Amino acid sequence: MTEKHTLRLADPSAIDSIISVDEFLQIKEQYDAEQPLITLQTKFNLAWALVRSDSTQHVQQGLSLFCSIYKDSPERRLECLYYIALSHYKLKQYEESRRYLNMLLSKDPNSPEALKLKNRLYDAVTKEGYIGMVVVAGAVVSVAALVGWASKRLFSKRRP
């Protein structure tokens, strides 16, 4: 019997679009209005809004909120695993993203959103690997050219 997927998660591509200032302010106002007894959903909404920001600091704050929700609310743990993985992905912390994503997939292997994120993660790691190889190759060529140039100058000065 195939396990049916039940979690409702944002598509991983949602991380690519930046939250509007108006939407962020609306969520932040709701969060502030509920002080000191903030509902779990409002805290979650703020975390998601922060992660969709273009500010690394905001993304880190959102990640921290998701981790707090994960710790304090067992009923939202699977959902939080996904958003923690997505947050790490946005921060380009791919190993951490993979770790949380694997935790989620071990509990919910049929999650379409998690499987999409897994593919995006693979593509990002592959792309970074290629970029890394190009950078290293460029550095090797530069060093070789510099050594060649220095050797030529050194040996050309030695001749009588």
UniProtKB/Swiss-Prot annotation:
One of its GO terms (molecular function) is molecular adaptor activity. TPR repeats lie at residues 78-111. The gene is fis1. It is a single-pass membrane protein. One of its GO terms (cellular component) is peroxisomal membrane. Has a role in mitochondrial fission. Has a role in outer membrane fission but not matrix separation. It comes from the Eukaryota. It is found in: Mitochondrion outer membrane. The keyword Transmembrane applies. PANTHER family: MITOCHONDRIAL FISSION 1 PROTEIN, TETRATRICOPEPTIDE REPEAT PROTEIN 11 TPR REPEAT PROTEIN 11. CDD domains: Fis1. Residues 1-129 are cytoplasmic. The keyword NAD does not apply. It comes from Schizosaccharomyces pombe (strain 972 / ATCC 24843) (Fission yeast). One of its GO terms (biological process) is peroxisome fission. Keywords: Membrane, Mitochondrion, Mitochondrion outer membrane, Repeat, TPR repeat, Transmembrane, Transmembrane helix. This is Mitochondrial fission 1 protein. The C-terminus is required for mitochondrial localization, while the N-terminus is necessary for mitochondrial fission. The chain crosses the membrane at residues 130-150. SUPFAM superfamilies: TPR-like (SSF48452). Residues 151-160 are mitochondrial intermembrane. Pfam families: Fis1_TPR_C, Fis1_TPR_N. Belongs to the FIS1 family.
